[in-house]
Amino acid sequence: MQLLILTTTKMKFTRKANANWKGTGMEGTGTISTQSTTLNNAQLSFKTRFADGVGTNPEELVAAAHSGCFTMQLSFLLNEGGFTADDLSTEATVTFEDGTITLIHLDLKGKVPSISAEEFEKTAAKAKEICPISKLLNTTITLTATLVS
């Protein structure tokens, strides 16, 4: 059975999130909640976005979505190639500059028995290209893939 589930299976679903904001951009505060309630009134403010305030921000949420989507897509591709990862860990770093997300860097570390470094890097590059969140984003996306023994 082919397992490119995230890109080839004819699926349609929706997910929802809500944002609420009160006040001005600088002084106001808001919350973000997700349908799954994983985020349930998570705090959002100028300080959480542009300084070190307690809470979350859109760029952090993009990084979380991208790292999760990419890592899951990679797992499907590895499985399709006959490999099962012992561990895949991806850190997404979102760069915000002059009002725009200018770069997202994916730093992948993976432990996958019996795969060559070349095959691992090739599969990771394919996952980066076909991950639905990668396709959604209109920015430069770079990748460092490290196979750990």
Could you tell me what each predicted segment is?
Residues Q2-A64, T71-S149:
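Extended beta-strand/beta-hairpin segments
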